[in-house]
Amino acid sequence: NSESQWASVKRALRVFDGVIPTVFATGNHDYGVRNAEDRTTQFNDHFPLTHNPLTCDGQGGGIFLEGPATRDGKVTLENAAYVVKVPGGRNLLIVSLEWGPRRFAVEWAREIFARPRFRDHLGILLIHDYLLPSNQRDGQDGNRKRPGNPHWYKTGLAGDTHDGEDLWNALVRKTPNLRLVLNGHEMGAHVGYRQDDNDAGKAVHQ
C-alpha cells in the first residue's frame, strides 16, 4: 500500500482507459501499511469513480451503477455494482466488494441483487477472499484463525468482516440470481472450484 506501488499499477492499467471498462476487488495488501493493519487505503486516490470513462464518466455513462456511501458520504469503487449489457445474451449484474466486507457492504449487495429490475440478470460477485485451493470456502471448517482468513487480520478483529463461508450464508445462498463467485487471494496455481445449489435450487459456481 505504498505510493510507488499504486502509481505503478495505475500506469500499467491506464492502457485500458477508454478501451474496456475495469472492475476492481480490493485485497488485504491494499489496506494499512502492508497487510490490512487497518482500513486506510490509497486505492481511491488512484482509482476514483471516473478513472476510466467506460467504467464511469461522471455523467451517467459507463457500466457503473452505484455504490454505498461511506461514513464520510463518499461513493467509491471499493464496493460497487455494475450493469453490463450483453447483445443477444443475458445482461450481467456485477457486484464487487471490499476486502473482508463489512456488514453494511454485504447488506447493500443483498439489496442490489434483490431489486426486481435485476431478477433476470446473471449475478456475479467479485471478492478477494472466498474459496480455498481445497475447494472449501474460507471458514467453512469453522477455523477463523487461519492465517489468510479475513478474521485473522487486524481489519477483522472487531468482528465486522466476512470470510467465504460468512458470505455464502449471508449473501450468496440467499440470492437466486447470484450464480457466479470469483475471488483471488490464493497465490500461484492454487485454484479451487465448487458448485452448490442456492436456497432457490439454482447452481452457484464458485
Language-model segment annotations:
Residues S2, F104-E107, P116-L178:
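Active-site-proximal segments of metal-dependent phosphoesterases and phosphodiesterases across multiple
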